[in-house]
């Protein structure tokens, strides 16, 4: 299998927690369970808190060996030394970000259920393409649905890319109970928010999610 630009496995997405100490402890627990990447996603926080949490998470993720990305705010990602940024449809243009940030910044992109969007963003150099929601999501209850077949079709596209190839990420309503479905459908990684960080045992939830990818490489 071609080497991936973005790590396979469990991709944690931060919940809307203002308590930074609680967040850092949860990230440690998730990493202990096998989380390979983390995205700071703070849609409701003010700029100061978002930046403070990014500055706290960047060195922690380096210590833990977890790839760290910032949602939307790619300049903040650069400022704190994050590994990458995640961009949605309404965020900065990925090609523009790539031109300004250089090849060293990982860029992940939301593709919803749109394979043609994925084709264009893969051509622009995206390091992963994310599809969802694959299951009903408590975080985005009104989001578009991306069926599991979308992951299978996306995988065929990324396998045609030169090595190291981009990854396929699934998001939306993923829990330890259903994560194996996205792995079997072709996702390299599962992005999980409440199914991880709202679990009664975060480390155990992380371990269960990570295991789905160890048996479905």
Swiss-Prot record:
Statement: the UniProt record of this protein carries the keyword Metal-binding: yes
Functional description taken from the UniProt entry: Condenses 4-methyl-5-(beta-hydroxyethyl)thiazole monophosphate (THZ-P) and 2-methyl-4-amino-5-hydroxymethyl pyrimidine pyrophosphate (HMP-PP) to form thiamine monophosphate (TMP).
Annotated positions binding 2-[(2R,5Z)-2-carboxy-4-methylthiazol-5(2H)-ylidene]ethyl phosphate: 137-139, 173, 193-194
InterPro entries: Aldolase_TIM (IPR013785), ThiamineP_synth_sf (IPR036206), ThiamineP_synth_TenI (IPR022998), TMP_synthase (IPR034291)
Cofactor(s), by name: Mg(2+)
One example of a Gene Ontology biological process annotation: thiamine diphosphate biosynthetic process
Gene: thiE
Pathway of action: Cofactor biosynthesis; thiamine diphosphate biosynthesis; thiamine phosphate from 4-amino-2-methyl-5-diphosphomethylpyrimidine and 4-methyl-5-(2-phosphoethyl)-thiazole: step 1/1
Species annotation: Bordetella pertussis (strain Tohama I / ATCC BAA-589 / NCTC 13251)
Positions of Mg(2+) binding: 72, 91
Binding positions for 4-amino-2-methyl-5-(diphosphooxymethyl)pyrimidine per the UniProt entry: 39-43, 71, 110, 140
Cofactor annotation remark: Binds 1 Mg(2+) ion per subunit.
Matching Pfam families: TMP-TENI
Family label: Belongs to the thiamine-phosphate synthase family.
Catalytic activity: 2-[(2R,5Z)-2-carboxy-4-methylthiazol-5(2H)-ylidene]ethyl phosphate + 4-amino-2-methyl-5-(diphosphooxymethyl)pyrimidine + 2 H(+) = thiamine phosphate + CO2 + diphosphate; 2-(2-carboxy-4-methylthiazol-5-yl)ethyl phosphate + 4-amino-2-methyl-5-(diphosphooxymethyl)pyrimidine + 2 H(+) = thiamine phosphate + CO2 + diphosphate; 4-methyl-5-(2-phosphooxyethyl)-thiazole + 4-amino-2-methyl-5-(diphosphooxymethyl)pyrimidine + H(+) = thiamine phosphate + diphosphate
Disulfide bonds: none
GO CC aspect terms: cytoplasm
Keywords, comma-separated and alphabetical: Magnesium, Metal-binding, Thiamine biosynthesis, Transferase
Annotated TM spans: none
UniProt-recorded name of the protein: Thiamine-phosphate synthase
UniProt xrefs under Gene3D superfamilies: Aldolase class I
């Amino acid at each position: 299998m071609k080497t991936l630009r973005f790590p396979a496995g469990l991709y944690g997405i931060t919940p809307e927690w203002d308590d930074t100490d609680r967040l850092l402890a949860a990230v440690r627990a998730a990493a202990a369970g096998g989380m390979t990447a983390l995205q700071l996603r703070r849609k409701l926080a003010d700029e100061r808190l978002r930046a403070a949490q990014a500055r706290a998470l960047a060195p922690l993720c380096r210590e833990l060996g977890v790839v760290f990305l910032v949602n939307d705010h790619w300049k903040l990602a650069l400022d704190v030394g994050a590994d990458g940024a995640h961009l949605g449809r309404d965020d900065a243009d990925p090609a523009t970000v790539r031109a300004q940030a250089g090849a060293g910044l990982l860029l992940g992109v939301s593709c919803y259920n749109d394979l043609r969007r994925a084709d264009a963003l893969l051509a622009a150099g995206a390091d992963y393409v994310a599809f969802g929601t694959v299951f009903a999501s408590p975080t985005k209850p009104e989001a578009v649905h991306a069926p599991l077949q979308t992951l299978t079709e996306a995988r065929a596209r990324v396998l045609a890319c030169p090595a190291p190839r981009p990854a396929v990420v699934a998001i939306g309503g993923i829990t330890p109970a259903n994560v194996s479905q996205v792995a079997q459908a072709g996702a390299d990684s599962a992005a999980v928010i409440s199914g991880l960080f709202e679990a009664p045992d975060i480390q155990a939830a992380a371990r269960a999610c990570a295991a789905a990818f160890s048996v479905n490489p």
